[in-house]
């Protein structure tokens, strides 16, 4: 059971430096803020619009924001695939925060949360131009490069907690 500490979000973790990972609930004001970040960083540069089908799919997923001193700086969507397996998607960092370690902080925070929840394997489809970022976080490239939303992507997998069977 989730504890709803706020109308639109659940505080997951907070550190003394003002960084906080929050689960954000669909239809909340905070969710709309996450959508704006995702649109600005992932869709607008490609001239992509938001579709109704994507909105319906979003209702089935979990949404997280990384906040620094109450300002949203990053977001990630978590999709449960199988017991112990999750897919990360729509990973975004606000443009002014890019190149400052925010993406790494976001990934570590979500991985730590998911490990506590029993996830043993993470998957994601990385744009090829940022795959090295995930390489540095110990994600492994799997399979051939493929096209998604008109861009080359590669599937990447990470086994959590040293679990070597997946």
Predicted regions and their residues:
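Conserved catalytic-core motifs of GNAT/GCN5-like acyltransferases
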Residues: 123-125, 135, 140-155
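Helix-loop element at the rim of GNAT/NAT acetyltransferase active sites that forms part
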Residues: 24, 36-50
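Conserved beta-strand in the GNAT
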Residues: 65, 71-79, 87-92
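Short loop/turn motifs at secondary-structure junctions and domain boundaries
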Residues: 54-59
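A conserved beta-turn-beta hairpin within the catalytic core of GNAT-like acetyltransferases
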Residues: 80-91, 98, 148-153
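Conserved acetyl-CoA-binding loop-helix of GNAT-fold acetyltransferases
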Residues: 93, 99-112
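Conserved GNAT acetyl-CoA-binding A-motif
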Residues: 107, 114-127
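A short beta-loop-alpha structural element at the N-terminal edge
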Residues: 18-34
